[in-house]
Structures are given as structure tokens and as C-alpha cells.
């Protein structure tokens, strides 16, 4: 059994760790609020550009490379979104597991998987396992901004536009010598953690390219008239320039904004996961201190009882010795 001094040392150590986890919990909580605010701030633009694309969908042929499913595709890019820091519970483990499942499905479908990773934890994971990574970007998982994620967005769009038969230009972050072109791909998938609530975050797969245009949760047909929720035909719009030209200009913007929204949502999910992990660690530390304190008190009581017993026994022995004299 541990001595009282050892127990007190453990209590001090656990309390010290508890202060750290509590501080991390509070920091993560404040970051969740900020991240949620950024997601909400980006929503109006995303909704408006989606609305414009819906209008264009009814007036254009939709014959655009970013919308076209390529027959006989050979290569598929997978972007795995992880965190730069740890202490986030199962956040990184879950998204890496989801990515492995996706890569297996793509390989079984005949695609060569081209892996890209954001976040230091994901980079370290694949490096430790000696698995190939075509490009890595770090330093913005908790606080993504438009400029920091520029090379990620542009490379994925350029690579898809080039297709597996063409080549995309080198960009910073790719694991190739500067200036060397990289072979393109026919699909782009993003594996990230979806923020549902403070307590729930789920790893999901989103097909970024080719774009799957959706109107009121239904895949629209080429040239289909838009109907309002009441079943009435929506007004006919005139576009200047023509709808196909506008679609050509807006689709890259839409894809860029969608990917940036994914980074923002992943940042919120990371902070929420870290907050939950740190809260659980703080609660466990509190319970452990209670248990250790109870054991220490019991040991102290036993020690005091033993000392009293020894004193009483000694006094009795002295008394008996005096009487015999």
C-alpha cells in the first residue's frame, strides 16, 4: 500500500494536470463559439451562390467539366482533413479510419487513389506508416482563412480540370520538386468531421468534384424548369452574359467556397471534440483526487489509531512497571 506521502504527491500531480485540462477545456469552448460564428457568417454567401446556380441550372445545358461524371476514370483524389494539435479525443482517429474505408472502396472500383492531407496529426500518421501522400498543408486547422487554404483549393480544382490524362501545375505543399507538374485526377473526395452539436461530431465523406448540383434536395435534370415549394413555376430569368458563361465563372467559385466551408466546419468540430475530451479528463481527474484523498485519509486515520494504540500501550506498560516497583 502506498504511503501517505506518496498519496499526497499523486494528489498534487493530478490536481496540476486537472488545471491544464480545465484551461484547455475553456480555451476550446471559446474557440467553438468563434468557429460557429465564422460558419454562420459564411452561410449567406454560400446560400446565395447556390441559389444562383439553381437558376442557371434551368437555363443552361449544364455541360461543364466540373459537373460531368467521367467514364473510365482512373485516378481519384482524397483530401483528409485532420488537426494540427492533439488532445482532441477520437477526432483524428475517426477521420483517418473513415479515409481508409473510402480509399478501399475507390481501389476496389478500379481507381488509383491520390492522397492529400491537411493537419500535422494526419501528416505524422501517414509518415509513421510510410504511406504515400501527394501533398500536405498544415498550420490552419483551428483557424482556417481564405489565403491559407488557397493552394489546397486551387490544386484540387486544377488537378480535376486537367483529368487523369493531363497535368496540373505545381503548387506549394505538394511533395514534388518545385516547378514539376503533377498528373490530374477524375474525382475529388474530402474526408472531414462534420459539426452537428457540441456533443456530436461525425466523420463524413463529401464528393467535391464532379459537383452534384442539388435543388431542394433533389438532383436536377438538365434544362429542367424550377418549381416553387407551392408547385408554381418560378419566373423566367434573363442572364447577362448567357447562362453557360455565368456557370463557367461561378462553378470554380462555388467549389472553392464549398471547400472553405468544410475547413470552417472541421475547425468547429475539432474544438468541440477537444472541449469534450478535456472536460472528460477534468471530470476523471476530479474523481481520481476524491478517491486518492479518501485512501489518504483512511491511511492517516489508521496511522493515528496505531500511534494512539502505541501510546496507550506504552503508558500501560509504564504503569505496570511502577506498580511492580
Curated annotation (Swiss-Prot):
GO terms of biological process kind: proton motive force-driven plasma membrane ATP synthesis
Keywords (A to Z) from UniProt: ATP synthesis, Cell membrane, CF(1), Hydrogen ion transport, Ion transport, Membrane, Transport
Record-level Gene Ontology MF annotations: ATP binding; proton-transporting ATP synthase activity, rotational mechanism
GO annotation, cellular component aspect: plasma membrane; proton-transporting ATP synthase complex
Subcellular localization(s) per the UniProt record: Cell membrane
UniProt cross-references to Gene3D superfamilies, sorted A to Z: 3.40.1380.10, ATP synthase, gamma subunit, helix hairpin domain
Membrane topology per record: Peripheral membrane protein
Taxonomic superkingdom: Bacteria
InterPro entries with a match to the protein in the record: ATP_synth_F1_ATPase_gsu, ATP_synth_F1_gsu, ATP_synth_F1_gsu_CS
Pfam families associated with the record: ATP-synt
Assigned protein family: Belongs to the ATPase gamma chain family.
Subunit structure: F-type ATPases have 2 components, CF(1) - the catalytic core - and CF(0) - the membrane proton channel. CF(1) has five subunits: alpha(3), beta(3), gamma(1), delta(1), epsilon(1). CF(0) has three main subunits: a, b and c.
Entry function: Produces ATP from ADP in the presence of a proton gradient across the membrane. The gamma chain is believed to be important in regulating ATPase activity and the flow of protons through the CF(0) complex.
UniProt cross-references to PANTHER family, sorted A to Z: ATP SYNTHASE GAMMA CHAIN, ATP SYNTHASE SUBUNIT GAMMA, MITOCHONDRIAL
Protein's name according to its UniProt entry: ATP synthase gamma chain
Amino acid at each position: 500500500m502506498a504511503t501517505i506521502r506518496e498519496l499526497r504527491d499523486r494528489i498534487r500531480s493530478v490536481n496540476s494536470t486537472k488545471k491544464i485540462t480545465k484551461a484547455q477545456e475553456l480555451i476550446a469552448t471559446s474557440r467553438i463559439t468563434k468557429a460557429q460564428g465564422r460558419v454562420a457568417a459564411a452561410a449567406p454567401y454560400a446560400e446565395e451562390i447556390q441559389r444562383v446556380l439553381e437558376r442557371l441550372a434551368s437555363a443552361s445545358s449544364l455541360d461543364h467539366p466540373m459537373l460531368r461524371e467521367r467514364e473510365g476514370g482512373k485516378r481519384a483524389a482524397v483530401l483528409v482533413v485532420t488537426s494540427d494539435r492533439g488532445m482532441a479525443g477520437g477526432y483524428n482517429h475517426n477521420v483517418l479510419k473513415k479515409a481508409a474505408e473510402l480509399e478501399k472502396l475507390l481501389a476496389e472500383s478500379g481507381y488509383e487513389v491520390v492522397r492529400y492531407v491537411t493537419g500535422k496529426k494526419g501528416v505524422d500518421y501517414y509518415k509513421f506508416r510510410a504511406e504515400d501522400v501527394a501533398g500536405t498543408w498544415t498550420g490552419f486547422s483551428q483557424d482556417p482563412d481564405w489565403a491559407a487554404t488557397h493552394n489546397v483549393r486551387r490544386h484540387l480544382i486544377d488537378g480535376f480540370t486537367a483529368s487523369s490524362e493531363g497535368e496540373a501545375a505545381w503548387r506549394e505543399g505538394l511533395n514534388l520538386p518545385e516547378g514539376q507538374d503533377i498528373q490530374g485526377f477524375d474525382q475529388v473526395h474530402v474526408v472531414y468531421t462534420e459539426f452537428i452539436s457540441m456533443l456530436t461530431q461525425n466523420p463524413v465523406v463529401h464528393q467535391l468534384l464532379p459537383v452534384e448540383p442539388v435543388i431542394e434536395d433533389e438532383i436536377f435534370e438538365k434544362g429542367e424548369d424550377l418549381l416553387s415549394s407551392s408547385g408554381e413555376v418560378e419566373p423566367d430569368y434573363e442572364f447577362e452574359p448567357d447562362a453557360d458563361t455565368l456557370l463557367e465563372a461561378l462553378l470554380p467559385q462555388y467549389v472553392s467556397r464549398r471547400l472553405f466551408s468544410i475547413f470552417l466546419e472541421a475547425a468547429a468540430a475539432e474544438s468541440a471534440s477537444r472541449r469534450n475530451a478535456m472536460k472528460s479528463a477534468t471530470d476523471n481527474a476530479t474523481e481520481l483526487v476524491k478517491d486518492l484523498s479518501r485512501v489518504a485519509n483512511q491511511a492517516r486515520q489508521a496511522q493515528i489509531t496505531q500511534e494512539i494504540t502505541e501510546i496507550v500501550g506504552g503508558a500501560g506498560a509504564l504503569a505496570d512497571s511502577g506498580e511492580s516497583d
